[in-house]
Amino acid sequence: MTVKLTIDCMGGDHGPSVTVPAAVNFVRSHPDAELLLVGIESAIRAQLKKLKAQDLPALTVVPASEIVAMDDPVEVALRKKKDSSMRVALNRVKEGEAQACVSAGNTGALMAVSRYVLKTLSGIERPAIASALPNPNGYTMMLDLGANVDCEPQHLLQFAEMGHALVSALEGKDRPTIGLLNIGEEVIKGNDTIKRAGELLRASTLNFHGNVEGNDIFKGTVDVIVCDGFVGNVALKTSEGLAQMLSNIIKEEFGRSWLTKVMAVLALPVLMRFKKRVDHRQYNGAALLGLRGLVIKSHGSADAYGFEWAIKRGYDAVKNGVLERLARAMEENAGSLEQAARDASGAGQASPIAGQPAEPYAAQSSKA
């Protein structure tokens, strides 16, 4: 099976200087992958020439005349830049010419344009950003990580359904455990939204573990952790900052004297394994779930190594049939999700119209 992905080469802080080398490295190690490199043709070809990769048959350059800048408002990306590398890459997925799109572009713009071009799956009101965070036994899937700052209880239930389908597809688990991120394990804790979401999850057919706390994220307590995008994005950035700080402290301490430098040489194998386990670049690439196409969001600041991992996330998602499994799961649970929405509306909680852009998109950090 050939996996064909589109790469938004102009997205992110570094553009083609990062995205093109990552794409070249990826196809050289994955012979069953084909990548469509979308963006300013001259800039892409200059990088390919630099890498001596002009003739790689697995790479195809797709011209696009505009770039969505990292600080562009959503409205500009959506209404004015219709020939942007982001828009063209997503259109190729919509038209069936590729199976997934990978972009390091402006988060708010990517979510809004993806939603406009690809539309949402039946039963999904708001797509969510999901990514894997390391734990001692592998990883914990967490969502939402920044797409929806404010959520209603039924949205958190939808996120749980999508997280369940994603982990089932990637890990082969029939009933992955679901946790709801809260300030305590007790059902009486949390705000009204969290309490109501907990009730919906307990009444669902999901394997709901219950409330989990921030320290459970890296323990591997559950397979999937659900939260709103504000909390999720803060947790993600905090973990990345902590990992970087620990690496810097260790490097500084081992460089203090000749004795510590000798100790560093002796401990090098252990240090290298530690660095690899906490290197957030290996976890780069978050899936935009709930759309009628696969979209992978890379960090805007990612280097070539990190962006290559984002490409791998898209590749793995296609190979494991994530989109098909997600669509099937949403269809099977459509009744319970609709009932949850009606219950929430009956309790006086506003529910946005399905298919309409959610307000939080415009407020997203461009590098989330």
UniProtKB/Swiss-Prot annotation:
Matches recorded under PANTHER family: FATTY ACID/PHOSPHOLIPID SYNTHESIS PROTEIN PLSX, PHOSPHATE ACYLTRANSFERASE
Gene3D superfamilies: Isopropylmalate Dehydrogenase
Pfam families the record matches: FA_synthesis
Quaternary data: Homodimer. Probably interacts with PlsY.
Name this protein carries in UniProt: Phosphate acyltransferase
Location in or out of the cell: Cytoplasm
HAMAP family, per database record: PlsX (MF_00019)
Pathway note: Lipid metabolism; phospholipid metabolism
EC number from the UniProt entry: 2.3.1.274
Superkingdom of the source species: Bacteria
GO molecular function, a single term: phosphate:acyl-[acyl carrier protein] acyltransferase activity
Any one Gene Ontology BP term: phospholipid biosynthetic process
Annotated function: Catalyzes the reversible formation of acyl-phosphate (acyl-PO(4)) from acyl-[acyl-carrier-protein] (acyl-ACP). This enzyme utilizes acyl-ACP as fatty acyl donor, but not acyl-CoA.
Region (Disordered): 337-368
A GO CC term assigned to this protein in UniProt: cytoplasm
Family: Belongs to the PlsX family.
Keywords: Cytoplasm, Lipid biosynthesis, Lipid metabolism, Phospholipid biosynthesis, Phospholipid metabolism, Transferase
EC primary class: transferase
Catalytic activity: a fatty acyl-[ACP] + phosphate = an acyl phosphate + holo-[ACP]
Alphabetized NCBIfam families for the sequence: plsX
